[in-house]
Amino acid sequence: MSGSGRKDFDVKHILRLRWKLFSHPSPSTGGPAGGGCLQQDGSGSFEHWGPSQSRLLKSQERSGVSTFWKKPSSSSSSSSSPSSSSSSFNPLNGTLLPVATRLQQGAPGQGTQQPARTLFYVESLEEEVVPGMDFPGPHEKGLVLQELKVEPDNSSQATGEGCGHRLSSTGHSMTPQSDLDSSSSEEFYQAVHHAEQTFRKMESYLKQQQLCDVILIVGNRKIPAHRLVLSSVSDYFAAMFTSDVCEAKQEEIKMEGIDPNALWDLVQFAYTGCLELKEDTIENLLAAACLLQLPQVVEVCCHFLMKLLHPSNCLGIRAFADAQGCIELMKVAHSYTMENIMEVIRNQEFLLLPAEELHKLLASDDVNVPDEETIFHALMMWVKYDMQSRCNDLSMLLAFIRLPLLPPQILADLENHALFKNDLECQKLILEAMKYHLLPERRTLMQSPRTKPRKSTVGTLYAVGGMDNNKGATTIEKYDLRTNLWIQAGMMNGRRLQFGVAVIDDKLFVIGGRDGLKTLNTVECYNPKTKTWTVLPPMSTHRHGLGVTVLEGPIYAVGGHDGWSYLNTVERWDPQSQQWTFVASMSIARSTVGVAALNGKLYSVGGRDGSSCLSSMEYYDPHTNKWNMCAPMCKRRGGVGVATCDGFLYAVGGHDAPASNHCSRLLDYVERYDPKTDTWTMVAPLSMPRDAVGVCLLGDRLYAVGGYDGQTYLNTMESYDPQTNEWTQMASLNIGRAGACVVVIKQP
């Protein structure tokens, strides 16, 4: 018997079996399913011919070669053996079985070479496929190998066992002159579920504790396993078992710093690929996976924890992810904490934070709070939770509170507070904040990290309407500094171009403009919270290209064009009476004018007067109801963007001549006006020319939004830092806009 348990037949036994079973007459010539036939040779005896033998005989007869399938004579039977590469008839069940045989022939005088064979496991057979029989000899003139095809094995059961494919190569005609080693019939088999079946077998060995070659000891628990399986999924075990360390040869390995149940779960995962994730065990499992270097398990555990994030646990998950080196999980948990800080500070985890972790929260610009007062009260709540031990950390933590941005009433109360009056460092911080409020003209000299507002406290930047590729944008976008993203916030009631926008009580007031056919005097109010529009009383004058701003409560509509002429008139809207009234007119008619409020005065900058662009600037004093001329800008500008920052007025971009003038240029110049000295100074230019650019202050930086560069309506935005005198590219709008009105709402 062979090692596989199947019976091996010698050549004589095969011949006797064939002769006994097939030596009977058959009336038919044989078909694909009808078995073989008996043919009479020249000596008058009969022998059986199967379909494959018949084809082989005909092929050899065409070549003038006597077939070796004919019954050999007694003189040659002892020195010959049959050989084939065909489908052999199985007398046990009447099916044709593929037999692949590599015929090998040595050089003359070297004797007969043993045939190479490929065996297939066929589930319906009880005996191994009978190999082909080789009759090498000088009487063989040639042999045609049967063409074999790819046959899927459809005999597999529902379990998947025995699934696979047989791949057979095409045979070639071989003659005595050909090299029999170079022409062969080969078959290739690939089991579809081989790896799965193998690991199932290994799992059964694990359950029965068979062939285990290592025992992992953790605590009082011993876990048997197979080194090969563990090292195939874990880089930790692979390094241990393949390196020159003592554990590589030890049968028992002690594991430290790992939960026994988590280790057992991961050992089972190595065999099965299955893992159960539970909220109460996920941290132990993730810690073990990080130690054993199982990146796939680490990833799924991290995603599971991301789904569990809540204001009551996000601080703990963030700290745990940081300790385990799970960078992505830590980032997600940190972002969640920053976004939901208002709910986080109400939970027990916040009160239990160590001082080192708390200071990271207090120092962050990204905490989503409405004002600095919220962060200050959170610190005081944390200190009072364990006042005796935490008072020593108070001065260190108070330095991360932006005290200059607190209301002066709170600062006055802190000076004599029991927690602060005996702490010298706290007193210094409080005094610094008071100076910031008492000396506003010196604030530019007092800039520090404590005077920089947090991103969430500066409000939201809105871009309304403007000219786009569709001849007029009707969408409203808003920009969140904390996330650095633009999203659509609403829609206008209709198309408006060259209009103005002001903000009162966190509402947008859209004033004047033109709709493409006529100049408008209409006014509408948009509430971002309810996303509703309200119609307000119209202006007395139709205006497009006007400037709009808020000065000490009322809205001012300055200059513009009424469809016939350039205007120098100015109207003021009182939010209490909801009426428009005229105030003093400007010295010069101005359209596409830039306006801004600074130090209780209304400034009107540049613009066009009908013949040229203007460099002049004048300001309006509401207390005297008069306009006064100021020092002119260095450049003439129409379509200029204007905003104020730290007591200075900035003029940004624009054009220096009407578009009809072939010498017209679009500008990237930026100028700064100091009202104390009545002088203009050139500062860092924009990264590109921007005409009809929208400019406003957000936090401690100026933002230049959209515009026109001569070819494209721009969707880009850049911010200017007065401290570094540099422009920085920021997130882009969703669409390009020129002449968009940009404003900031503190509480969107």
From Swiss-Prot:
Residues 22-93, 151-182 are annotated as: Disordered. Keywords: Actin-binding, Cytoplasm, Cytoskeleton, Kelch repeat, Repeat. SUPFAM superfamilies: Kelch motif (SSF117281), POZ domain (SSF54695). The keyword Repeat applies. It is found in: Cytoplasm, Cytoskeleton. Gene3D superfamilies: 1.25.40.420, Kelch-type beta propeller (2.120.10.80), Potassium Channel Kv1.1, Chain A (3.30.710.10). Highly expressed in brain. CDD domains: BACK_KLHL1, BTB_POZ_KLHL1. GO terms for molecular function: actin binding; ubiquitin-like ligase-substrate adaptor activity. Residues 212-279 form the BTB domain. GO terms for cellular component: Cul3-RING ubiquitin ligase complex; cytoplasm; cytoskeleton; dendrite; neuronal cell body. Residues 51-66, 167-182 have a biased composition (Polar residues). InterPro entries: BACK (IPR011705), BTB/POZ_dom (IPR000210), Kelch-typ_b-propeller (IPR015915), Kelch_1 (IPR006652), SKP1/BTB/POZ_sf (IPR011333). It comes from the Eukaryota. GO terms for biological process: actin cytoskeleton organization; adult walking behavior; cerebellar Purkinje cell layer development; dendrite development; proteasome-mediated ubiquitin-dependent protein catabolic process. Coiled coil: none annotated. Kelch repeats lie at residues 460-506, 507-553, 555-600, 601-647, 649-700, 701-747. Pfam families: BACK (PF07707), BTB (PF00651), Kelch_1 (PF01344). PANTHER family: KELCH PROTEIN, KELCH-LIKE PROTEIN 28. May play a role in organizing the actin cytoskeleton of the brain cells. This is Kelch-like protein 1. The lineage of its organism: Eukaryota, Metazoa, Chordata, Craniata, Vertebrata.
